[in-house]
């Protein structure tokens, strides 16, 4: 049957599928736009299954704020070429739209309802059919809390700072997190077993070196703190002034409650 070119363009705009695939799907669907979308979706799922084992070492991370909540989506692909492709980039807005239907905060994709996961998986399957590469959802985050979101140029690193103060200060922290990738906010967050392992190691070393028993505990504490300092945000050297620790740049009353860092 003859398919109107305007229908082909509509389907292309909705799915990002190649024009030839759009035309064939419309022919198969007898011009029914919704049915043609479903045909493309099913073909995408079939292609997705064949590509599922291929490694996805490239991708991008995008953020979005709708005035109510902040959204982060990490989407992975096989090559940097596809990461710059309009079809790949268009998936982010579609996934953001799906995430807007979720109530409450989301720390990771494990928190997503099953129906939302299915919708996102269908979008990714369509993306696989369009780009010809394996695509995967690498992470999501949704929050209605006060956060500062920083996207490093190139969209390969994003950091989120949950805070109750000045956004300019939060921005400095977000830059610090993006650059130096700490695991913990403060020494209090370092797991007790990790501390205990180092304490035991340093204690044995100091005893073997003949240090007085009454001095060992204080020396061990200092050595343990120093060992973890590079991995604790508040104890790191401030990237703009190595003579200061991050905690020393925080104004009175400023509080950071937690942070996240996403990277490709």
Predicted regions and their residues:
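N-terminal assembly/interaction segments in proteins that build large macromolecular machines
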Residues: 2-264
């Amino acid at each position: 049957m003859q398919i109107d070119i305007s229908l082909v363009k509509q389907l292309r705009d909705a799915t990002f599928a190649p024009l030839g695939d759009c035309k064939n799907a419309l022919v198969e669907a007898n011009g029914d736009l919704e049915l043609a979308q479903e045909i493309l979706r099913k073909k995408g799922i079939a292609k997705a299954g064949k590509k599922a084992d291929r490694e996805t070492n490239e991708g991008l991370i995008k953020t979005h704020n709708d005035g109510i909540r902040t959204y982060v989506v990490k989407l992975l692909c096989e090559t940097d070429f596809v990461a710059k492709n309009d079809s790949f980039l268009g998936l982010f807005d579609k996934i953001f739209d799906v995430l807007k239907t979720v109530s409450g905060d989301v720390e990771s994709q494990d928190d997503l309802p099953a129906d939302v996961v299915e919708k996102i998986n269908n979008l990714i399957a369509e993306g696989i059919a369009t780009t010809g590469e394996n695509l995967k959802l690498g992470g999501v985050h949704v929050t209605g809390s006060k956060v500062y979101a920083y996207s490093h140029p190139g969209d390969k690193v994003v950091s989120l700072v949950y805070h109750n103060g000045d956004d300019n200060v939060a921005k400095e922290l977000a830059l610090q997190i993006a650059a130096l990738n700490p695991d913990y906010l403060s020494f209090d967050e370092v797991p007790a077993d990790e501390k205990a392992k180092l304490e035991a190691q340093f204690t044995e070393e100091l005893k073997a070196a003949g240090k007085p028993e009454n001095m060992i505990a204080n020396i061990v504490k200092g050595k343990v703190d120093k060992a973890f300092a590079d991995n604790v945000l508040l104890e790191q050297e401030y990237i703009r002034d190595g003579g200061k620790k991050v905690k020393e740049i925080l104004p009175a009353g400023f509080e950071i409650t937690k942070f996240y860092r996403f990277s490709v």
